[in-house]
Structures are given as C-alpha cells and as structure tokens.
C-alpha cells in the first residue's frame, strides 16, 4: 500500500488515480495528522508526501518517521514547490509529472538499486 499525503483535493485525486491505474493500492489523506494516524495502524510500502501538509508538515512527518524503529525504513517520495535538500529523499516539483512519479515509485517498489529515499 502507498500512503499519499497531499493537501490539495484535485492533486490528491489525480495522483491517486495515476498510482491506482498503475496497479498500486493507495490510501490518500489530506493532512500530516491523518498520515500519522494511518501510520500508527499500518506500515505502507511507500510514502508520497507533500512537504506543505497542515497540522503536521511533511518535513515534520519525515523527522518523526526517521526516529521511529517501526517506520524509519519506509521509502519516501516528497512533493514540493521548490528545490530543497531532503537528505537523500527524492523531491518531485509541482506540478507533478505522472511518469516521473511512477518512475520513483517503481524504483523503490521493484527493488531496483537506488542511492537514497529511505528514512
């Protein structure tokens, strides 16, 4: 299961559709708090997190995940509006190009060799 956290309903729906059409099971949420609640109940295969989530930003969520032995290993793809250093986590700039998102997802979920993105 991929956990998608995106505050924009239109973008969230579009990205969810792209991922589902590629054969992935997706749980989509709008806030960092909702993402944290999902993560307390299940461990997804991959996180796609917007950096500008409400009530718990994407950056804060990433830091929490890095310090939790239950979640530190989950790969992350970040979404954002500007280039930032996320210490090895791939960042897709908005507007997200679907093929680039799918390339990152496939990179992590197919076990292909990579050099970052894990917590």
Q: Where is each model-derived feature located?
A:
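Conserved phosphotransfer microenvironments
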Residues: 50-67
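Acidic di-acidic motifs
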Residues: 6-7, 94
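C-terminal output helix
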Residues: 96-117
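Acidic, metal-coordinating helix/loop segments flanking the phosphotransfer/catalytic sites
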Residues: 28-46
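Two-component/phosphorelay signaling modules centered on CheY-like receiver
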Residues: 9-27
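Residue-level signal for the "D+5" position in two-component response regulator receiver
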Residues: 28, 55-56, 95
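A short, hydrophobic beta-strand element within the central beta-sheet of small alpha/beta folds
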Residues: 72-83
């Amino acid at each position: 299961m991929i956990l998608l956290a995106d505050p924009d309903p239109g973008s969230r729906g579009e990205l969810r559709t792209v991922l589902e059409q590629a054969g992935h099971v997706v749980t989509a949420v709008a806030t960092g708090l909702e993402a944290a609640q999902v993560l307390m109940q299940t461990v997804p295969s991959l996180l796609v997190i917007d950096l500008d989530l409400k009530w718990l930003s994407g950056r804060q969520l990433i830091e929490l995940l890095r310090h939790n032995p239950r979640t530190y290993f989950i790969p992350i793809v970040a979404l954002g509006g500007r280039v930032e250093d996320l210490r090895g986590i791939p960042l897709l700039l908005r507007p997200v190009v679907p093929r680039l998102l799918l390339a990152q997802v496939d990179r992590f979920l197919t076990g292909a060799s990579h050099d970052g993105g894990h917590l």
